[in-house]
Amino acid sequence: ERRLDEVRSALPAALDTAAENIVYKQRSRQRGTEQYTKRDSRGELLTVHEGRARLLVNLHDYIDTGLFLDHRPLRLRIGQEAAGKDFLNLFCYTGTATVHAALGGAGTDR
């Protein structure tokens, strides 16, 4: 807990932003559908610029934003390699990979 407080104190200066611009989330073990439970009702959306895509995320209302940072390189690669290809996203959670594919020129026209 002390380390978390130290990180929260240091982040605004390290990121050169105001403390109110930083959203903190603390994960704990979830069971069943608990991870999808609504935590807040702000409904505030933030636009994330990722490659050619503009993606809306909700940082407050749920534990997950739906935009996973570790998937970013793959989403960008999909956009780079999608031109002229059909794209079917069978494991879609948020559709962000599909957005990149569409922007990269993928389609389903035959």
Spans of model-derived segments:
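Conserved SAM/SAH cofactor-binding pocket of Class I
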Residues: E81-R110
